[in-house]
């Protein structure tokens, strides 16, 4: 079964989506990620989606669900690298991604997570 790698960096999980997302892969990512949050006890999740050129309503809902589930499991989520076409599509589909924090780059996303968790923006492991 195809899976998206989930890496741990400091007190964060980093997910870099480098393949075209389909429904089954999105569901697997949701399950894998929530399980890793519980297993590791991390406080932040960064999802990098710059390779995604197309996002449909299901994938948009999954991203929203991941952020909501992460919050329930005491971890903040930031989605980074969203392409303009993806943002336009999400708005046209009526998906506001309520509660999903975004940033333009991985660096800005990590800084946002560190700030929201009260950590130094230049903390190094």
Predicted regions and their residues:
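Non-catalytic signal-transmission and effector/linker regions of two-component phosphorelay proteins
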Residues: 1-8, 118-125
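STAS-typified acidic loop motif
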Residues: 2-30
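Short, contiguous, helix-prone interaction/anchoring segments in small proteins
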Residues: 21, 31-35, 45
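Expand to "…catalyze enediolate/carbanion chemistry for C-C bond making/breaking, isomerization
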Residues: 26-33, 39, 74, 107
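Extended mid-to-C-terminal alpha-helical interaction segments
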Residues: 31-37, 56, 62
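Catalytic cores of nucleotide-enabled group-transfer and carboxylate-activating enzymes in metabolic
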Residues: 37, 66, 111-116, 123
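Amphipathic alpha-helical interaction surfaces in cytosolic regulatory modules
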Residues: 42-43, 47-96
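Short acidic-hydrophobic, aromatic-tinged amphipathic segments that line or gate anion-handling sites
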Residues: 99-109
């Amino acid at each position: 079964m195809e899976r998206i790698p989930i890496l741990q960096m400091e007190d964060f999980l980093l997910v870099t989506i480098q393949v075209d997302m389909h429904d089954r892969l999105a569901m697997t990512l949701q399950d894998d990620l929530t399980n890793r949050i519980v297993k590791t006890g991390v406080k932040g999740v960064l999802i990098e989606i710059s390779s995604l050129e197309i996002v449909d309503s299901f994938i948009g809902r999954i991203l929203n669900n991941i952020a909501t589930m992460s919050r329930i499991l005491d971890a903040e989520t930031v989605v980074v690298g969203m392409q303009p076409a993806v943002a336009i599509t999400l708005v046209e589909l009526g998906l506001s991604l309520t509660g999903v924090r975004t940033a333009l780059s991985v660096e800005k996303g990590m800084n946002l997570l560190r700030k929201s968790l009260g950590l130094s923006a230049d903390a190094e492991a």
